[in-house]
Amino acid sequence: MTLDDFEMVVNVHLLGAAYCSHAVWPIMREQNYGRILMTTSPSGLYGNFGQTNYSAAKLGQVGLMNSMKIEGAKNNIHTNSIAPVAATRMTENLMPEEVLEKLGPELVTPAAIFLVSEDAPNGVILQAQGGQYSLATVVENNGLDLGVEASADDVAANYEAIVDMAELKTRGMLQL
């Protein structure tokens, strides 16, 4: 993949979302209400072979959503993301026919409609595939305080405790 190919996909998926949001933002702010729905992808959330450009752009949309949810909250502007898996021209050669038959795009629609409704949450990523819906989110564990004198050796020696996922939390901003 050339850098031009990489940039083209980022321009379409990430900058396209930014341009569209930028166009409607003043209107939503003025009316003190709005709903924006980004279309991210499981490829952006988890990665996918051969899709580094697409994956980077789609996860970039999640970062955009995370900031927009904070900036828009005071004006009742909710920004959410949907991560669909559906049978489309883009996926028809990636999955067997019997799988594609269960992934009609119409099965993504209920989640999309909810995420732009008056009752929509703010800052949520819903995955939708074949009638199954789930939350995707960034989590953080409790970590381990090694102190201000920590070295790379300290991190290595305590790595298992640092990455222990027994207790998870979500939070929006770095809290010290």
Task: State where each predicted segment sits.
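Active-site loop-to-helix junction immediately N-terminal to the catalytic Tyr of the SDR YXXXK motif
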Residues: 1, 47-55, 67, 95
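Catalytic Tyr-X3-Lys loop
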Residues: 2-18, 33, 37, 61
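Short alpha-helix in the Rossmann-fold core of NAD(P)-dependent oxidoreductases
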Residues: 10-17, 21, 49, 57, ...
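A short, exposed helix-loop element centered on a Lys and neighboring polar residues
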Residues: 21-22, 66
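A short helix-coil junction within the Rossmann-fold of NAD(P)-dependent oxidoreductases
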Residues: 23-32, 118
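Residue(s) in the substrate-gating loop at a strand-loop-helix junction
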Residues: 41
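Active-site-adjacent segment of SDR/Rossmann-fold oxidoreductases
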Residues: 46, 62, 67-77, 118-120
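C-terminal helical subdomain
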Residues: 81, 99-176
